Amino acid sequence: MSQISRTQSIMATTAQEHLETGGRINWLASLNTAFTPARNFRRTSIICTIGPKTNSVEALNKLRDAGLNVARMNFSHGSYEYHQSVIDNVRASVAAHPGRPVAIALDTKGPEIRTGNTAGDVDIPISAGTVMNFTTDEKYATACDTQNMYVDYKNITKVIQPGRVIYVDDGVLAFDVLSIKDDQTVEVRARNNGFISSRKGVNLPNTDVDLPALSEKDKADLRFGVKNNVDMVFASFIRRAQDIKDIRDVLGPEGKQIQIIAKIENRQGLNNFAEILEETDGVMVARGDLGIEIPAAEVFAAQKKMIAMCNIAGKPVICATQMLESMIKNPRPTRAEISDVGNAVTDGADCVMLSGETAKGNYPAESIHEMHEASLKAENTIPYVSHFEEMCTLVKRPVSTVESCAMAAVRASLDLGAGGIIVLSTSGDSARLLSKYRPVCPIFMVTRNPTTSRFSHLYRGVYPFLYPEQKPDFDTVNWQEDVDKRIKWAVTRAIELKTLTAGDTVVVVQGWKGGMGNTNTLRIVRADPDHLGIGQME
């Protein structure tokens, strides 16, 4: 049986098919739309928000079986006791059924602008054409009415201008700014009918606001995350690179391994995206608030631009918000929602995210299943060789030794029709760079670091394997012997999981000695349970 035919039984498409088909258009024209990809090889990770419907070990087991990779906690809601229970339940689920690691993400509330409390805490009716005031006068903080609506952003009169728009309650109500009456009052006119309740969110599109990156609540939440060893922080309403630095300062040395993912949710963040990308560990295209702050039609282009910039930088990117929203109530998604997931995958997103679908929806496991299926199909449409060639032309030279090895490993995997790439990693950086070049085959990352094994779910195509044996004393154990032992273990495990077929060619990426930053060696071995060929070139 040929190498190509063996690999074809495992992978959606083979390297040889990619090489022979040519350009992107010809590749797409030759797609077999009825092809069923291997169910155990999904490159894109799935992030799920954990809520009351799913916060139990039993429910989490079902989500993991359906395809959960990262469990998200939304700190806009819930007490510390509740979030502690989520963390405990996720870890209990993993302990009971080890399998692949599950990462835990803390999503911050972030700096927000909100209205005050209405008088008597009753909904205030608003009619189109109504002229009223938005004010920072504290006497209206608990007594909002149809004439004066309190907002808790003291500098609103300094940053807003006549002709701008103010949105309330996620854009349900829109107000045109007529004038700045004094240093506390903005005069507005309602565009549409509706109601305002207490403490509703306020958006100021196309306006640079000077809110701090972190509220006192956010700082306390981050300290809670450090204490509980969360794997990543989804940082809300990031506007500038300094915001990321401020978060790192709060996380401190104890939280240095926590990955910071910048949520881009406003025009300011979009305008400053290049500097934010340089500072952050990854990005979330948070389309909910972004779709209020900028025209909805522009979000489509912004998504593609940000994902492409992340791909070029080799940093993970998440696409989020309302991806399968209808499944909160319905057992099946709309065709438009499936297309939205597929579009995010083909754009180049490393992860896709579910919010209300798994936090409060009636069909949480089914939502993950649908996202899993949509991602698999979409991944099969990507011309990986074309992507690799373009990435090689875009990389800034000279590159690091580690990145040079990653490029060479992906090239070798394509030329050999390899069934997989095995990378031995401590920090996860080698796996991240391999993911950047999008090989056709899976990337099996072997690490002794539990945190690295979890946050590597951020990288597309990376399968984290947590090696169970402790690091030996290399004064008494030969370094290469330990390397060979880890490679054999990874090959055996990948075959057991049916993500690798016995006899496949495997590209191995390793270091010449222990520690981070020493990756500089490629080896070619054969996956054979009886004779893996370790220790010799084949």
Swiss-Prot record:
Its EC number is 2.7.1.40. InterPro entries: Pyr_Knase, Pyrv/PenolPyrv_kinase-like_dom, Pyrv_kinase-like_dom_sf, Pyrv_Knase-like_insert_dom_sf, Pyrv_Knase_AS, Pyrv_Knase_brl, Pyrv_Knase_C, Pyrv_Knase_C_sf. Pathway: Carbohydrate degradation; glycolysis; pyruvate from D-glyceraldehyde 3-phosphate: step 5/5. Disulfide bonds: none annotated. Substrate binds at R72, G288, D289, T321. SUPFAM superfamilies: Phosphoenolpyruvate/pyruvate domain, PK beta-barrel domain-like, PK C-terminal domain-like. The record marks K263 as: Transition state stabilizer. One of its GO terms (molecular function) is ATP binding. It is an enzyme of class 2 (transferase). Its cofactor is Mg(2+); K(+). K(+) binds at N74, S76, D107, T108. Mg(2+) binds at E265, D289. Homotetramer. This is Pyruvate kinase. It comes from Hypocrea jecorina (Trichoderma reesei). The lineage of its organism: Eukaryota, Fungi, Dikarya, Ascomycota, Pezizomycotina.
